[in-house]
Each structure stands twice: as C-alpha cells, then as structure tokens.
C-alpha cells in the first residue's frame, strides 16, 4: 500500500462518516489524523437556511477571531494623500490609488485582503469583475471601506476575517491552523458561529445552521452537531 493509501486508511479509522460530533470531538478527530509536512489550515463550511436570491437574505460580515488565523496576510490599501501615508506607517503591504487599480485591471491579485477609503470606491468599484469572484472587493459591511485605515489594518493583523454566503447559501472560512491548541481552534470557531447567528436575516425561516463541517487541508470533513452551535 502506498503512503497516500495508508494515510487515507488512517483517516477513515478515526471517525464515523455518518455521525455528527460535538465541536470538541470533531477537532480532536482532526488532530488525531495522520500528519503531513506542513501546518494545515482548519476550515469550516456552513450551509445556512437562507435564500441567497433574496436581497435581504444575503449574508456578509466580519468577525475578530480571538486567536487569529495563523496566516500572515498580504494587505492592500487603496488610499491617497495622508491616508496612504497612514497605511504605509501602519504596515500595509501595498498602498496606492489609480496605479493599483490599473495594475489589478492587468490581472495582478497577489494579496489576501483589500481595504479602501470611501473616496477611492468610485475607481475601486470598476474592479468588480476581478475582485468580486475572489472575495477581495472592499465593502462597508465587512469593515474594509473605512476612513480609519490604521485601526482596520491592526484588526486584520490580529485576526479579523470576512465571511460571506455564496449562491448556494454556504459560508467557507479558514479559522485556524491545525497546530493551534484544541481550545484555541474551538474558541475561533465559536466566535465565527456567534457572528453567523447574529447575522441571521429576520426573514429567514426554518433551521438556520443546516449543516456544519470542519476539516483540515489534507484531512477529513467532520460533521458537527449544529444544536450545540446554535446555543452559543
């Protein structure tokens, strides 16, 4: 049997695919799976009981994870004048205005998150076809359209992330690294869940957290009992 086959078999022996687990149990399963040679990302996939076709049921927001994501973000800021100087001083990786807009129009997207001052949004809005599908478009709802670029950059460095439901009503979010302590992973997931529950549209009917799966980059997807999460 190949090393890959042995690893898959080892994963399959750690849990029951048909069973739902508590969040703590699910994290333990990920921790017990055969290791790989890099620090895997812990992702969650949440199916929400919404109709994304309705404008009042489109979920998008942000949350500050108590322990960060473990990822070093490449932050881009669209700003000019004093705000650009503030962004540079605050440690943004890329700062500019029309020059960055033109660069991105040419296909460059080598960054993880974009921030913009309100006065830049007329030009930044022209990048919708490039930034939108990559979930990189600054938005007021996510807190990435702001006059306080220093505060926003600091929050992003500390672990503020954006979440958004796709056309199927699913949110996919990276919340931690597998090397984090189990308690840290759990607290990050709980913070995300609390934010999702808070963002529930008033018009959404029936079960809201329909399905919740937690996984690692090379590990299994473990189903979590949503009753525990709704109670957060």
Swiss-Prot record:
One of its GO terms (biological process) is regulation of translation. GO terms for cellular component: large ribosomal subunit. Belongs to the universal ribosomal protein uL1 family. Keywords: Repressor, Ribonucleoprotein, Ribosomal protein, RNA-binding, rRNA-binding, Translation regulation, tRNA-binding. The keyword Ligase does not apply. The keyword Repressor applies. InterPro entries: Ribosom_uL1_bac-type (IPR005878), Ribosomal_uL1 (IPR002143), Ribosomal_uL1-like (IPR023674), Ribosomal_uL1/biogenesis (IPR028364), Ribosomal_uL1_3-a/b-sand (IPR016095), Ribosomal_uL1_CS (IPR023673). This is Large ribosomal subunit protein uL1. Part of the 50S ribosomal subunit. It holds the Pfam family Ribosomal_L1. Binds directly to 23S rRNA. The L1 stalk is quite mobile in the ribosome, and is involved in E site tRNA release. The gene is rplA. GO terms for molecular function: rRNA binding; structural constituent of ribosome; tRNA binding.
């Amino acid at each position: 049997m190949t090393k890959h086959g042995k690893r898959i078999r080892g994963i399959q022996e750690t849990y029951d695919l048909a069973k739902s687990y508590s969040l703590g149990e699910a994290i333990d399963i990920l921790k017990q799976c055969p290791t790989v040679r890099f620090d895997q990302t812990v992702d969650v996939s949440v199916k929400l009981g919404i109709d994304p076709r309705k404008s009042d049921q489109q979920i998008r927001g942000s949350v500050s994870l108590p322990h960060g994501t473990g990822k070093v973000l490449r932050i881009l800021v669209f700003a000019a004048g004093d705000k650009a100087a503030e962004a540079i001083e605050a440690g943004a990786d890329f700062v500019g205005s029309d020059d960055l807009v033109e660069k991105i129009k040419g296909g460059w997207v080598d960054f993880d998150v974009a921030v913009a001052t309100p006065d830049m949004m007329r030009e930044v809005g022209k990048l919708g076809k490039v930034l939108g599908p990559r979930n990189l478009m600054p938005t007021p709802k996510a807190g990435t359209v702001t006059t306080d670029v220093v505060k926003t950059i600091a929050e992003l460095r500390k672990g503020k992330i954006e979440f958004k439901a796709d056309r199927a009503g699913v949110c996919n979010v990276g919340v931690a690294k597998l090397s984090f302590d189990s308690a840290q992973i759990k607290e990050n997931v709980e913070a995300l869940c609390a934010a999702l529950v808070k963002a529930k549209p008033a018009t959404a009917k029936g079960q809201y957290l329909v399905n919740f799966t937690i996984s690692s980059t090379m590990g299994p997807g473990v189903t979590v009992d949503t009753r525990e999460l709704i109670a957060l």
